[in-house]
């Protein structure tokens, strides 16, 4: 019998503990996320509309889906306008938005939530105020970083601001300190850069190369406690700029998207992806007829295997979910097309920013019922709207 020395036993024990911790930290979530992975899907999709868009990106460990989605949307607008698309720096947009959010935090004496999230209009607001950079000029990957990782940056920035607002009088140079902290994590923003043999600033690149006009776009949302077709401030944590949205009835959300797609316009979309009917691993989102508690083991096992019946959502149910925080503004994606399953049921083709590690290489198929239930907001070109909608919202 082989006898182990005390040091060897300690090493083995530590190794077992480490492996156990790694399993619980990474193994169990992976198993949970992939509990249906061995069941072959029976979905068959036929594309009806698939509009031009750039490649799927990976936002990494950063809550910048709004910037990835908003800039993907602008890249598709370049394609629609007959321009050669360029990958717009998502982190430049996010960085400038973080500065604006910090300014509002300070103006409100700390009375504003801070975080990495944002709304789609932030992309347009940054474009309007600062311009834009290509990814080749500013990746936001500093030092040896190969992907976005804000886990250290965000707490540090928030701590800086919390200390700042407790200081009286307010330091006049606080923005310099904030910018220096951003530089330390993301790298300095170049004042000028070369792109395809020509020198640009962020302003001239936005105007001359990308060429969109921020005022040509409209943001829409749907609530029942505000007048329809009137602008209102959507009170969600990531609307830190307190921008307004035009309010439309729930039933109009999918009609508006359908019209836009038919006219050749893509749509940027913010939504809630915390529901059990959303599965990134399967590339699907729908509204199950039953809750998970009501499902049998077999029904749970086949939730994303074949097209399932959906529960019809009412405007009252949608509003209740928004008010009780069942629906939250936790993600943004880019609607680029329309498809039917083998039974003729329509799905939107949606581009995500979580890389390509799902069955549809980074895209998802989302039912109209899910969109009606879980939409927070839409952003699209004004010309994508029907005349009667444009008239009602006085565009």
Residue ranges and their predicted role:
Residues 40-268, 353, 358-360:
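Active-site nucleophile-adjacent alpha helix/oxyanion-hole segment immediately C-terminal to the catalytic cysteine
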Residues 2-17:
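N-terminal Sec-pathway targeting helices
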Residues 1-4, 34, 166-172:
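Generic structural signal for short, solvent-exposed loop/turn connectors between secondary structure elements
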Residues 32-42:
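Acidic, low-complexity proline/glycine-rich segments
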Residues 20-34:
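Membrane-interface motif at the C-terminal end of an N-terminal transmembrane signal
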């Amino acid at each position: 019998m082989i006898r182990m020395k005390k040091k060897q036993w300690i090493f083995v024990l530590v190794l077992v503990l480490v492996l156990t911790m790694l399993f619980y930290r990474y193994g169990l979530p992976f198993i949970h996320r992939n509990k249906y992975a061995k069941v072959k899907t029976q979905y068959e999709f036929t594309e009806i509309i698939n509009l031009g868009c750039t490649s799927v990106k990976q936002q990494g460990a950063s809550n910048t889906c709004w910037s990835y989605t908003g800039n993907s949307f602008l890249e598709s607008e370049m394609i629609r306008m007959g321009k050669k698309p360029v990958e717009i720096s998502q982190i430049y947009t996010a960085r400038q938005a973080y500065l604006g959010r910090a300014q509002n935090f300070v103006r409100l004496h700390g009375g504003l939530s801070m975080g990495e999230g944002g709304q789609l209009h932030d992309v347009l607001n940054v474009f309007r105020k600062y311009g834009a950079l290509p990814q080749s000029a500013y990746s936001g990957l500093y030092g040896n970083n190969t992907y976005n990782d804000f886990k250290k940056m965000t707490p540090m920035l928030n701590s800086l601001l919390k200390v700042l607002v407790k200081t009286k009088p307010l330091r006049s140079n606080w923005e310099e300190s904030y910018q220096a902290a951003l530089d330390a994590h993301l790298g300095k923003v170049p004042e000028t850069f070369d792109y395809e043999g020509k020198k640009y600033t962020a302003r001239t690149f936005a105007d001359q190369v990308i060429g969109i006009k921020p005022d040509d776009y409209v943001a829409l949302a749907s609530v029942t406690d505000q007048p329809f077709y009137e602008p209102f401030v959507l009170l969600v944590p990531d609307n830190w700029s307190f921008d307004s949205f035009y309010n439309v009835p729930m039933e109009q959300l999918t009609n508006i998207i359908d019209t836009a797609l038919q006219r050749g316009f893509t749509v940027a979309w913010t939504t809630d992806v915390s529901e059990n009917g959303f599965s990134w691993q399967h590339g699907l989102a729908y509204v199950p007829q039953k809750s998970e508690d009501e499902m049998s083991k077999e029904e749970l096992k086949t939730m994303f295997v074949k097209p399932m019946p959906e529960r019809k959502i009412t405007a009252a149910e949608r509003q209740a979910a928004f008010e009780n925080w069942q629906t939250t503004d936790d993600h943004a994606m880019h609607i680029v097309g329309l498809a039917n399953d083998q039974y003729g049921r329509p799905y939107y083709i949606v581009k995500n920013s979580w890389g390509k590690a799902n069955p549809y290489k980074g895209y998802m198929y989302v039912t109209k019922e899910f969109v009606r239930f879980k939409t927070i907001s839409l952003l699209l070109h004004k010309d994508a709207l029907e005349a009667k909608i444009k008239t009602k919202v006085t565009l």
